[in-house]
């Protein structure tokens, strides 16, 4: 139980730092607003770089213990962007030769995300 609680604290601390970093980047780039979501794109691409580096280092070397991976990959990157997790999971499926599941996850998440975004918006309009 103690180990699980420690893991939750690590993920929470990393998530706080990641979400805060995302907000600060959005604030810093707000003066360059052009209608294009530059901050979101930057965060998503940077998050992919970070989760790729963190995961590779923790899986192939002893440089990052599992606790640090929880803090950085699950916590920080998870709070920073879930897009990085999405891309990493697709790459893991491809690495395992699961082209069908990788494609299903890629397309299903994009299409499903848009469909449910509009469903949520429609439901909110009904309530308002």
UniProtKB/Swiss-Prot annotation:
One of its GO terms (biological process) is cellular detoxification of fluoride. InterPro entries: FluC. GO terms for molecular function: fluoride channel activity; metal ion binding. Na(+) binds at residues 78, 81. It catalyses: fluoride(in) = fluoride(out). It holds the Pfam family CRCB. Na(+) is not transported, but it plays an essential structural role and its presence is essential for fluoride channel function. It comes from the Bacteria. It is found in: Cell inner membrane. GO terms for cellular component: plasma membrane. Belongs to the fluoride channel Fluc/FEX (TC 1.A.43) family. The gene is fluC. It is a multi-pass membrane protein. It comes from Prosthecochloris aestuarii (strain DSM 271 / SK 413). Fluoride-specific ion channel. Important for reducing fluoride concentration in the cell, thus reducing its toxicity. This is Fluoride-specific ion channel FluC. Keywords: Cell inner membrane, Cell membrane, Ion channel, Ion transport, Membrane, Metal-binding, Sodium, Transmembrane, Transmembrane helix, Transport. The chain crosses the membrane at residues 7-27, 34-54, 70-90, 104-124.
């Amino acid at each position: 139980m103690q180990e699980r609680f420690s893991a939750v604290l690590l993920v929470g601390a990393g998530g706080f730092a990641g979400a805060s970093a995302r907000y600060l980047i959005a604030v810093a780039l707000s003066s360059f607003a052009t209608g294009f979501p530059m901050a979101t794109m930057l965060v998503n691409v940077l998050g992919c770089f970070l989760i790729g580096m963190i995961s590779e280092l923790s899986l192939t070397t002893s440089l990052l213990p599992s606790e640090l991976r929880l803090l950085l990959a699950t916590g920080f990157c998870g709070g920073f962007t879930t897009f990085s997790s999405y891309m990493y999971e697709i790459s893991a499926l491809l690495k395992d030769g699961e082209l069908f599941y990788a494609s299903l996850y890629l397309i299903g998440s994009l299409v499903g995300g848009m469909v449910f975004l509009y469903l949520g918006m429609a439901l909110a309009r009904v309530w308002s």
